[in-house]
């Protein structure tokens, strides 16, 4: 008889070994290389004793994939799917199945990273270029970015940009029309406070009465009204104000674009182009402006350049505007955006094309006209005289009956006040839905006939779009929007683009400080469940009890992980989390009469988002030096804290440091800052080396954001979505963000919002919930310990060939390490960019380049990579070192060798002539491990300078590809 127990056979911890890459035998061999006999021993060797904790997590025992999915399904069932007419920027939509299965559910799309290495990212770059073209066409403007986080934060970015470019330098006032979405006004007010802007909210028609640097209008407005805003825009611009217009892509298929009316900026939510509501997200915001403002535009911009063979190639353009380069002088702190969702929206436009989109918009508009005519026949007073898809109306005498019938029929109307209602129709609504809507408004015996109403609309009984606002201009005329309308062609187009990109489904992506770990299939499955996808964020709370339980449980787990006392799920990126955390710190200081505290200390090794976030809070950034070992220089820190004195607000510190070590003095850093009255903001970028081993709260931090798209398995999506919830100690809890429409328990009522929806991109919280449920407390600690093992194994093996720039106690690194390439450059003229491009020939994405130290690469393997994959990567770097040595020895010229010519493409090796001093095999199959499944870059090295000097951010003519 076997001594194995039933509990062992049930194997509840099976997922742990699925998530963690090295097998038990591989771990044993790797530990032997490091001279230790267990993960526990390595952890004690590596993590300072002052912060190392015994196993402490209370997140429960691990569950199998099946068990966790069943548990989450029971939570999901507590959400009620009702028919939403709420609108306000969120609409039910029909996701084309070819996009659902082949993009949203496809790891080739969702596990890629932000396209910093464009030669192996041409697919998603093309999809993003299509998104920009779509945005430019529909808004009527010259230039668009490749997505922002949501409509409300895009509005805040528009305000900040308006201040940068406005010629009315004397004014510090910004006007917001009172018919802008409520949640947008909320977020803009929050952002404006620490910029020192005066916000004026009033009727749109009064905008030009004020002396302002900028104005925000909504078109169509919150009530659905269509106004011709051309004259108002002109009046504002005559007074040197910049005009930003929040708009709706679906309406712009039928109504005159704001760009044609003179708007300087147009933005909004692209959600209704084939992305589920998801109780608030994730969705891609669009943002367009005029060419003259291009250097002030926030977010990523995709541009057309050329490669070394002169062929068109795409890249992220004008990166010098961004936080990772300009730091506190950046246009925005945006890092992660919403690439996956922008790509879905762009594919939606490609699949339907201009005719299909126009047909969808016409159907929505026709149903709205039918409803409006039916209401008028019933004597209902409409507030708006013109509309696209939204009606606001008054039914004071029957309000209670309307609400009761709506609830019984499962309909959610927008309640705009006592007896005032609003309805917004969308792509998913049908004539049957209109029948139900009439029944809710007027009872079963309403006597309205949809076909009769339709014939009257067709006969001209309704003029809902004024003649001067009917769209006359064309859009989406580029061939890409007119070729892929059968599913066969669309499927092949998506696959063609996917094949151009390297993602985690092909090989390790060892980007330091980015934590490109496994995004398990079981974690992804619930994202597409309708119980999570089809809820409007402003639906009645009783319909979202599943979401409330999801958020509550996940918050409890993350509080346990971080050692904090409260958690906010509202920030929808790490950068937004930083901003929300600094906001809580400043509000806390103000509550104690210390509003003068405005100095933020930031180590020189910090991520670029840190100083960019601090400047958004109008803080003065003071840089703290690091010593020769890569640690914060305690003498310099003390001197600068002393100098700041009573003006010290906080320090922003990353732990483990971005130099890849656990700093021994981290508790001393926290104590010193606290002694000077400051708060400690611990950047959560490197939490993957803390979970279950130590915690920010235990170390002494007051607030942190968590990158759920790093540590807790939300995929990077090629540049988003992400989530950046913040944890805080109790004294900061009341200063967490709240929401103007849906009040959140805990934070003070009236606290401003930092995102459009109360729980940010709520639908992807399911991914992190699944990860923690399946790993349990034991698995989470093992993941951190294995991340430490993999990094130290890499460092040990590579140290025989390269200098590992920084090490901590016992000569260990944390979960990542920095490899010094400067000697290679000195000897052979081979720079880190050459190593990065050459790695593509070996089938790898480059590690992080020149951060935090120029001339280096930072490698983070994560716990999900096997020993075999680590060995393959080690072999690639060692081989590249040998190639550089040949250059140094003069065997290959410095200007003509496999490194400076990398990456190599099929076009290179099929050239009739080959005039290089190395053979084709060396170029493309440099080691045996580059096998039959080799990844081929589809373009050669891209000319960055040419791309920025000849900025082109729209789809190039197809002839340019010939």
UniProtKB/Swiss-Prot annotation:
GO molecular function annotations of the record? glycine binding; glycine dehydrogenase (decarboxylating) activity; pyridoxal phosphate binding
In the Enzyme Commission scheme, what number(s) does this protein have?
A: 1.4.4.2
Tell me what reaction this enzyme catalyses: N(6)-[(R)-lipoyl]-L-lysyl-[glycine-cleavage complex H protein] + glycine + H(+) = N(6)-[(R)-S(8)-aminomethyldihydrolipoyl]-L-lysyl-[glycine-cleavage complex H protein] + CO2
Highest rank taxon of the organism: Bacteria
Q: Which cofactor does it need?
A: pyridoxal 5'-phosphate
Q: Offer a single GO CC term for the protein.
A: cytosol
Q: Which residues carry this modification: N6-(pyridoxal phosphate)lysine?
A: 710
Q: What are the UniProt keywords, alphabetically?
A: Oxidoreductase, Pyridoxal phosphate
Q: Which residues form a coiled coil?
A: none
Asked if Protein transport is a keyword of the record, the answer is no
Listed GO biological process terms = glycine decarboxylation via glycine cleavage system
Q: Name one Pfam family in it.
A: GcvP2_C
- InterPro entries noted in UniProt: GcvP, GDC-P_C, GDC-P_N, GDC_P, PyrdxlP-dep_Trfase, PyrdxlP-dep_Trfase_major, PyrdxlP-dep_Trfase_small
Output the NCBIfam families linked to this UniProt entry: gcvP, PRK04366.1
Q: How does it assemble?
A: The glycine cleavage system is composed of four proteins: P, T, L and H.
Q: Provide the family line.
A: Belongs to the GcvP family.
Recorded hits in PANTHER family, A to Z, give: GLYCINE DEHYDROGENASE (DECARBOXYLATING), GLYCINE DEHYDROGENASE, DECARBOXYLATING
The task this protein performs is described as:
The glycine cleavage system catalyzes the degradation of glycine. The P protein binds the alpha-amino group of glycine through its pyridoxal phosphate cofactor; CO(2) is released and the remaining methylamine moiety is then transferred to the lipoamide cofactor of the H protein.
Output this protein's name: Glycine dehydrogenase (decarboxylating)
Which organism encodes this protein? Idiomarina loihiensis (strain ATCC BAA-735 / DSM 15497 / L2-TR)
Which gene is annotated as encoding this protein in its UniProt record? gcvP
